[in-house]
Amino acid sequence: MKNRSLTLRLISVLCLTALFVWLGSTLVAWWQVRHDVNKVFDAQQVLFAERLANSDLSTILLESSTTLNKNSQSVLKKSYDDDALAFAIFSKTGKLLFSDGRNGKDFIFNYKTGFYNANIYDDDDKWRIFWRMAANGELVIAVGQELDYREDLIEEMILGQMWIWFASLPILIIVLGWLIHKELRPIKRLSQEVQTRKSGDVSLLNTEGLPVEILPLVKNLNQFFDRTSAMLQRERRFTSDAAHELRSPLAALRIQIEVAQLAGDDVALREQALLHLTQGIDRASQLIEQLLTLSRLDNLQALETLQLLDWEAIVQSLISERYFVAEKRKITLVFEKESEPKQKQGQSILVSLMLRNLLDNAIKYCPEDTIVSVKISSSQIIIEDNGGGVEPEDLKKLGQRFYRPAGQNEKGSGLGLSIVMRIAELHGFKVRLENVVKEGRRIGLKAIISL
């Protein structure tokens, strides 16, 4: 469909609407004027007939056996000289006794009383004639008016109104054009703002002064710009983080490769370099995997395909999965169910990943011969250990991306807890980390997930 000017379309529609409304109003006005004019003239005819019936003229005509002469007609005619009306007075036998000397003498006698539309002698035009008995039925008075006279008057009144409207039509179009242009000015300003916007500019559009009808569209655009801005920030952060964090592992891999190349016949040195190389590749792979996982989680605005979470099944599956890793490090895994947890919906895979990261951190950073317990209650999931806890300064920073407390012997990326926090946020859970204190002594660390 061809794009057209909104201003032109509005003016056209409004003018056509005004035209049709005017035509309808004109038809109604014509009908009303016609009705009122006929009513007024009918009343005028009745009144004139009453005056003739009550005048001395009736007595004169009854006492005289002949019609009045022309001089008498002229004198009586002067008392009511109106081109709109004609009259005649007949005897009850139909003899014309008196008339206005013009059209009245051509009336065709009708003994019936009341209003009738009829022709007269030597005239094809219709007349509306009022017939009335007078002088105890001895006389018949007829007062008539040509219907064309009425129609001409009605037409003159209606055309007078039409010319006024047609004369005001150009003024109406000019005023409508000015008003529409004025009201569409904020939309044009918005259009210019979008057209002149530079590539990559995701700042919010100005909503001040915009019509209410277009405000939802602009708000949706601003929401889109917000999401786009957040996505670009996440991509830039991901690129920066990946470049920063991969620099050290890649440099270490290069060193190990050089060591292996320089080992010569020293088999033990070469084997050690290759072992370190393998471990470095594993750490780099884990870092990349966690970076990609965190990036995917950051791009999620809301979860889809939710299902009811079976907390007990998820926890028991994780404990079984990590049992041998814990046993190798001489760590005991314990599962405690204090009460039935709240029924929550979510994605089991993500919830399992969240709990796995917490459980892996406890297993990885706890010393040997410690206990890691997973407790389920109605409103909380708690993963607790007795591995000595962390310093209060470090506790505040846990969960920040790439943050790892100083003095850690175990290798890691510092992204595990960030992934935990993001998954919890997507599910509406709250995660907090606390040191376990007993008798004033720090004995361990616990992660509390509030459902």
From Swiss-Prot:
Q: Which GO terms describe its molecular function?
A: ATP binding; phosphorelay sensor kinase activity
* Record membrane topology: Multi-pass membrane protein
Indicate whether Ribonucleoprotein appears among the record's keywords: no
InterPro entries the record matches: 2CSK_N (IPR013727), HAMP_dom (IPR003660), HATPase_C_sf (IPR036890), His_kinase_dom (IPR005467), HisK_dim/P_dom (IPR003661), HisK_dim/P_sf (IPR036097), Sig_transdc_His_kin-like_C (IPR004358), TCS_sensor_his_kinase (IPR050428)
Q: Which residues lie on this side of the membrane: Periplasmic?
A: 32-162
Q: Which GO terms describe its biological process?
A: phosphorelay signal transduction system
Residues with the Phosphohistidine modification: 244
The organism encoding this protein is Haemophilus influenzae (strain ATCC 51907 / DSM 11121 / KW20 / Rd)
Among CDD domains, the record links this protein to: HATPase_BasS-like, HisKA
Q: Which Gene3D superfamilies match?
A: 1.10.287.130, Histidine kinase-like ATPase, C-terminal domain, Sensor protein qsec
Annotated EC: 2.7.13.3
Chain ranges passing through the membrane: 10-31, 163-180
Keywords from the UniProt entry: ATP-binding, Cell inner membrane, Cell membrane, Kinase, Membrane, Nucleotide-binding, Phosphoprotein, Transferase, Transmembrane, Transmembrane helix, Two-component regulatory system
Taxonomic path: Bacteria, Pseudomonadati, Pseudomonadota, Gammaproteobacteria, Pasteurellales
Primary localization class, coarse:
membrane
Name the catalysed reactions: ATP + protein L-histidine = ADP + protein N-phospho-L-histidine
* Its job: Member of a two-component regulatory system QseB/QseC. May activate QseB by phosphorylation.
Q: Which NCBIfam families match?
A: PRK10337.1 (NF007664)
PROSITE patterns from the UniProt entry: HAMP, HIS_KIN
* Record's protein name: Sensor protein QseC
The HAMP domain is annotated at 181-233
The organism's place on the tree of life at top rank: Bacteria
**Cellular component terms per the entry's GO annotation:** plasma membrane
